[in-house]
Amino acid sequence: LMLDADRAVWAHIGDSRLYHFQDGKLVFQTKDHSVSQIAVMLGEIPLSQIRFHKDRSLLFRALGQSGETPAPQIDEQTLENGLHAFLLCTDGFWEYVLEEEMEQDLQAAHSAKQWLSSMRQRLQARAPRGNDNNSAIVIWEKIEKRED
C-alpha cells in the first residue's frame, strides 16, 4: 500500500486482503485469487459463503508457488476528503471478522489501535485454538484537500 496526497496504490496476491474504508464505510476490498472467488464471480455461490466454501484455500495465484513468480494485481483509487482506513489482513483474520463488523468497530473506534483491538477480540472469540494465520495491520489517513 502506498498513499500520497490524493491516491492510494496497492499490489496484492493470493487470499490476503486489503479493505479500504472511507468515513467508516467499506468502499473497496480486493478480490481473492482463489477457486472460491471464481465461484462468486460466476454466480455459483454468494459472496457471503466464500468464508465457508470447500475450495477457499485453493489459490491460483500466490507467493511461494513453484515455477514462475506470479504477477501481483495492482489497483489504485483516488482519495476524496475524509478519514480513510485501510486494513491489510490474512485469510485467517477475515474468515472470522465480517465486513459489517469491521465497519461497526471502525465507527466506534477513536484510534487505529482501538479498531484493530476490537476486531482481534472478535477473531479470538471465534477462531479455533492454535489459529496462527491471523496477521493484520491498519492504517488511518485523514485527507483534507484544499478547494480551488
Regions found by a protein language model. Name each.
Residues 13-15, 23, 56, 90, ...:
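ATP/adenylate-binding site constellation spanning eukaryotic-like Ser/Thr protein kinases
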Residues 7-8, 36, 84, 126:
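A generic hydrophobic-helix recognition signal that picks specific residues
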Residues 1-22, 28:
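Conserved catalytic micro-motifs used in adenylation/nucleotidyl-transfer and phosphoryl/amide-
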Residues 61-89, 93-148:
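C-terminal catalytic subdomain
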Residues 20-25, 38-41, 99:
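A short, polar/proline- and glycine-enriched secondary-structure boundary/capping micro-motif
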Residues 8, 17-18, 36, 95, ...:
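Short, acidic Gly/Pro/Ser/Thr-rich loop/turn segments
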Residues 31-84:
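Conserved, helical-rich catalytic subdomain that frames metal- and/or nucleotide-binding sites
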